Structure formats: structure tokens, C-alpha cells
Design a protein with these regions (language model features):
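Flexible, glycine-rich loop/tail regions that form catalytic "lids" or insertion modules at the edges
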Residues: 1-177
Length: 177
């Protein structure tokens, strides 16, 4: 795996996971803390991320992003329980309490965001209008992964576009040209 990543970088191209790792590393070295949570965030649902390595001999988890530089910002990657509503609510609160941290919540599959829809409707898209309190929570919603079925593959981006009003959220579909 590590050799494959090195080969990608030598070739001048990067897949999504490599670009994401480079972005996280850059933010950490510049002093911005990063917190990522979701059901399978360390490894990545599609085995693409590999932010954590498990040593089967010692039963220890190693997170290389935590060891880039002694002066770097804090990095947390958390594999959460299967309670989208509860975990997204916690991460929303975390983003309010620590607005200088890049706080990300990732749905394991696109349709898993359904379980947190109340949190999105009542808090995330309306917190600034209701309480004058902006949130920097980033939702990572896998979308368009064919082969998982029509529901499992859809994060329902149209639903988020309908929630956009007065600059309350940004909906981005990050892809390659």
C-alpha cells in the first residue's frame, strides 16, 4: 500500500485518498487541528484512506498523521458507533465549541445520512439564522458509488440543495475533470 502511494506521488497524480491525506497533513503542519469521525473513517469504507494501521503482533494502532512534526496541530480520526443522529449531533456541538478545528463527519454510505436528517434540518442548516452561531462542520457524503444499489449509493444531494438559503451551507461535488 505505501509503495503504491509513493508511486502515485512520483507520477504526479493523486487519487482522492492521497489528496485528502496531503490536505490533512498540510493543515496540521500549518497549525489547524483536524477531527474526522464516522463509522469507518480510519480505514475508509472502501479501503481507500488508511489513516490508521493496526499491528496484529502488538495490537497497537498507529496513526502516522499524529507524528508529522512535534509542533503540528492535533489530529483525531475516530471510528464512531452506528448512530448517525447521535454522532452528527456530537460533532455539530464540537464544531461550535472548537471553531478553529476542521471538524468532519463522514457517512459510511450515502443513504446513512438519512438517520441524521433531523440534526441537519433543525441545527446545521439553521444555527446561524436561529442563534447567530455559525458551524464549520463538514459533512462527507459518499455519492455515486455504483454497485451498492440505488439507495445506498445516493447522498441525495438534491435534498441539500433545497436546504440552501442565505449562504447557510455550501454544497460541493468534488470530482475530477
Amino acid at each position: 500500500f505505501i509503495e503504491k502511494r509513493k508511486e502515485i506521488l512520483r507520477g504526479g497524480t493523486a487519487d482522492w485518498a492521497t489528496g485528502e491525506a496531503l490536505a490533512f497533513g498540510t493543515l496540521l503542519l500549518e497549525g489547524t487541528p483536524v477531527r474526522l469521525s464516522g463509522q469507518d473513517s480510519g480505514r475508509g469504507t472502501f479501503s481507500q484512506r488508511h489513516l490508521e494501521y493496526f499491528d496484529y503482533n502488538t495490537a497497537q494502532v498507529h496513526t502516522p498523521m499524529m507524528h508529522l512534526d512535534p509542533r503540528q496541530a492535533r489530529f483525531e480520526v475516530l471510528d464512531s458507533c452506528l448512530s448517525e443522529y447521535g454522532v452528527m449531533g456530537f460533532e455539530f456541538g464540537y464544531s461550535l465549541g472548537d471553531p478553529l478545528t476542521l471538524t468532519l463527519w463522514e457517512a459510511q454510505f450515502g443513504d446513512f445520512v438519512n438517520g441524521a436528517q433531523i440534526m441537519i434540518d433543525q441545527f446545521i442548516v439553521s444555527c446561524e439564522a436561529k442563534w447567530g452561531q455559525p458551524s464549520g462542520l463538514v459533512l462527507l457524503l459518499p455519492h455515486g458509488y455504483e454497485g451498492q444499489g440505488p439507495e445506498h449509493s445516493s447522498a441525495r444531494p438534491e435534498r441539500f440543495l433545497q436546504l440552501c438559503a442565505e449562504d447557510n451551507i455550501q454544497v460541493c461535488n468534488v470530482t475530477t475533470p
